[in-house]
Design a protein with these regions (language model features):
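C-terminal ends of transmembrane helices
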Residues: 1-5, 40-51, 140-149, 207-216
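Alpha-helical transmembrane segments in multi-pass membrane proteins
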Residues: 12-16, 20, 32-35, 39, ...
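Small-residue-rich segments of transmembrane alpha-helices in multi-pass membrane proteins
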Residues: 14-25, 59-72, 162-171, 201, ...
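Structural signature of hydrophobic alpha-helical transmembrane segments
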Residues: 26-35, 121, 125-135, 188-202
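Long hydrophobic alpha-helical segments that form multi-pass transmembrane helix bundles
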Residues: 51-139
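Loop-to-transmembrane alpha-helix initiation sites
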Residues: 54, 58, 194-200, 223, ...
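A beta-strand-loop signature enriched in Asp, Gly, Thr, and Trp
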Residues: 167-220
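Cytosolic-side transmembrane-helix boundaries in multi-pass membrane proteins
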Residues: 239-283
Length: 283
């Protein structure tokens, strides 16, 4: 802002509020500083600043941290609310605020059982980043964004539909016996298709990330395609990614790149339809 001689743009405030929700709470501040500088300069300013960037800045920061410091983002140093240790502590009569443990996606990926029930997953009494755990609060936020027209309901709905379709396909593969329990993919592929929406960050990504008005598709039909592919790819990456059992941020960044292409073909398709109608009327 000082270099360009104008006020600080409000778009950075949104990024500043979202980033703490998608990173571990004990990540060193110097790492976060480096990542934010990268996200702002490479993810936004290089393209011309607010309104011109093609990648979601918060996800650019998240991606930089994941690839530059993977052990802090998905390794033993990740601080989460635990599972087995929590139950043991409760059984011993201890009171815990939080401990280090494995996320639900990590447990499923390893073929382990999960001690949380569906209501724990819905209310947010589960391991995970701050923003992704409580599905109830995410839904409240989604209703607010839709009511104020700040977020597209088409993108939210289509993202969830895409995730459900991919989950159904994987369930069908397991039910058909094409994948056995010995497969390393069996754990996540056998998860009920609807449960994918209440574990991990698919719901958070659909509401707060995919709906970014700058980097998402602008046409109505394009929003349906854009959102569906995000959900579809998110579950696919979640199952097949051997290093990190979550694919939402990668899927959104990928579709950010293809959003202009989707809109281009949607617009061209509409132009061709109108030209045909015009020829029919003038014939």
């Amino acid at each position: 802002a000082i270099i360009k001689g104008h006020e600080v743009e409000e778009g950075y405030l949104v990024t500043g509020m979202i980033v703490p929700l998608i990173v571990p709470v004990d990540i060193p501040l110097w790492m976060l500083t480096v990542a934010v500088i990268f996200g702002v300069v490479i993810g936004k300013e290089v393209f011309g600043g607010t309104g011109m960037n093609i990648l979601n800045p918060a996800l650019t920061i998240r991606a930089f941290l994941f690839f530059a410091y993977p052990t802090w983002m998905s390794g033993d140093k990740v601080w989460v609310h635990g599972a087995v240790e929590r139950d043991q502590a409760i059984a011993a009569g201890q009171n815990l605020d939080a401990i280090s443990g494995e996320t639900i996606l990590g447990s499923y990926a390893q073929g382990n059982s999960v001690v949380y029930d569906y209501w724990d997953m819905f209310w947010g009494i589960i391991p995970g980043s701050v923003g992704e755990t409580s599905k109830f609060l995410i839904i409240i936020g989604a209703l607010f964004l839709i009511f104020t027209k700040m977020g597209s309901w088409r993108i939210i709905v289509s993202t969830l539909v895409g995730a459900l379709v991919m989950g159904l396909i994987f369930n069908g593969v397991v039910d058909a016996g094409w994948i056995g329990e010995s497969s390393k993919f069996y754990g996540l592929m056998s998860v009920p298709f609807w449960q994918h929406l209440i574990i991990g960050s698919i719901l958070f990504g659909a509401v707060y990330m995919a709906t970014d008005p700058v980097t998402a598709s602008q046409t109505n039909k394009g929003k349906w395609i854009y959102g569906f592919l995000i959900g579809f790819l998110s579950i696919m990456i979640r199952v097949f990614n051997p290093a990190y059992p979550e694919g939402v941020f990668l899927a959104i960044l990928l579709m950010n790149v293809f959003a202009p292409t989707i809109d281009h073909y949607v617009v061209q398709g509409n132009v061709k339809k109108r030209m045909k109608r015009l020829k029919v009327k003038t014939a």
